[in-house]
Amino acid sequence: MADLGTNVRYIKGIGEVRANALEKLGIVTLGDLISYFPRGYEDRTAVRPIRELTAGESVCVRGMVAADPTPRRIAGGRTLVKTRVVDDSGAMDLVFFNAQHLGSSLRMGETYVFFGRVEDDLRRKQMINPLFEPEGRQQVTGRIMPIYPLTAGVTQGLMARAARQGLDACRELLPDVLPDGIRQAHSLCYVNYAYENIHFPSSPEALEVARRRLVFEELFLLTCGLQLLRQRRRDVAGPACHPMDMEPFYRRLPFALTGAQRRAIADAVGDMVSGKPMNRLCQGDVGSGKTMVAAACIWFAVENGWQTALMAPTEILARQHYQGLAPLLARFSIRCALLTGSTRARERREILAGLADGTIDLCIGTHALLTEDVQYQKLGLVVTDEQHRFGVNQRAALSQKAEDPHLLVLSATPIPRTLALVIYGDLDVSVIDELPPGRQKVDTFALGESYRPRVQAFIRKLAAAGQQIFVVCPLVGEPDQIPDERKAVTAYARQLQEQVFPDLRVAVLHGKMKPKEKERVMAAFAAGESDILVSTTVVEVGVDVPNATCMVVENADRFGLSQLHQLRGRVGRGKEKSYCILLSDSRNEETRARLKVMTQTNDGFVISQEDLRLRGPGDFFGQRQHGLPAMKIADLSCDMRLLDEAQTAARQLMAQDPELTEPTHQALRDRIRQLFDTNADMLN
């Protein structure tokens, strides 16, 4: 008796050879097969009279073969078969290449249904290599056909036949994991209907009903699984912290915190005194003051006797954190150290000794914090900055330096809260949704190439006023044609220096530089020793130069909105008016609409939502946590409403049955365990 775990090679009609081909697509079991959903569909339901056909469209035609399909040899040793079909409205030619045995399946005088792309050879309409079936015995014409993602050795025909055989084999095996009450409340179809019509829809309406059910189920299962993970993590003891009044910390700061910063700090401190490990994401717009939330948590941890590790994605950003936090935290006698890949051996040994004996309270660094010889006496808090620049394996490695430390993740990529729950999994979310007083609004302009002389004159005017300018240029072209990053940026900077701004000081920054060289260039720019910094997107994250008042982005159409917003965040950090100029000569309407969004708002959450709508969630999902199930059918660029419905339904169900232990929820719990296989031990 087959079950969903049965290898597809044992399914009737598939066998060893087809199973080996399907395995290339990740299809091993019957469950894999029926969950390998089409990426699109081809509507072959419309049968059109020949007279009404238009060149370029793909349609079905019902006609009688009116000429004997006789093969003949053509140049190159190929075989060509040409015939003609007629219906009540006219005639059309059919052309087949390398189909010398066609005569045995296509007989003159008989009626067939043909599907293909209509061509126009000036004399009459024709189809080249159309699909065809005898009238009344149709399987691939006259219906909506699935289009699957393929790989070498697997055709659409093989995939469709395998899906048909898989569905036939498991018709009685599919448990409906959605509780009846939820299915009925959300007007969802039964599971068998959903799988049948997602693969072989009987109509466009049936396809929509099936997809809605499967998307809801996928998001519902994900939400329930994350809720179970949260509950399991709450069963673990975190580093003990006692409640403390935060006012002594606030009073000694050189500036007042915003209400949003105080709320985020209260969230984090509440986690830390709960007795359970904090797992919190603090997300806020560029310049919203996330670092001060981290500083408050560091102070709170140190006051409770714990050490902290803060890991940044680049040495530039790590050093910047150190330069900002060390003097601030020195007010509270907190001892800080900076540990990066370029730290000298002697200094490194001293830092390692200080971490091991507890004389260093806070260590700020890069991936160097992950090496085996870095050991802490009493690590209680881990802070990671710019989460999207880290693999979660790195974050986990840092957390393993202590048993279940508190974790605070800072992200300047604002995303909708519902989406954050999907991407960051079991992290609780705090949002800093207001900027500190005095933070400048950056005026943004999207301009074409014709404006370049005026932009250059504007840059010269700013430089004459003692202000500085970033110029970001992407690497343009196909991957195998992109010039060496160092050469591309250096050549562009040389052009600016020699031909455009010979009287200004132009510096270069790119990712291929050694850390010390990057540091030297950035330090010189921050000290005002250069007027223009030409860079790749290495300046996207965290670089803080208050005197820089203009960001010019070349070929701005090459970037997503969220990335452009991050680049824009490098300016507007001082007292002077700041500007962002997006240069693009693209005539694409969608591209122009995207860049227009940048000129209309400085709100990172609005921009993020628009980026999600225009480009889909792919950029965000590069950040997804390891161990979360892959999404097979949900598309969060268009399924956000269903996500909201599914999350609400899941929360309501788990408020009634937090562990899903009721007998009616057994199938649901088993399915969640199967999906969260890498975290299954946490769901026991």
Regions found by a protein language model. Give the residues of each.
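C-terminal accessory region of SF2 helicases/translocases
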Residues: 587-684
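Long, highly charged, low-complexity intrinsically disordered interaction regions
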Residues: 1-11, 20-23, 221-222, 232
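Inter-lobe coupling/hinge segments of SF2-like helicase ATPases
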Residues: 234-237, 277-596, 656-660, 684
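OB-fold nucleic-acid-binding modules
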Residues: 36-66
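Short, surface-exposed secondary-structure boundary micro-motifs
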Residues: 64, 117-118, 225, 556, ...
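N-terminal pre-P-loop "Q-motif" helix
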Residues: 255-278, 292
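Upstream accessory/linker segments immediately N-terminal to the RecA-like ATPase cores of bacterial MutS
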Residues: 71-252, 623
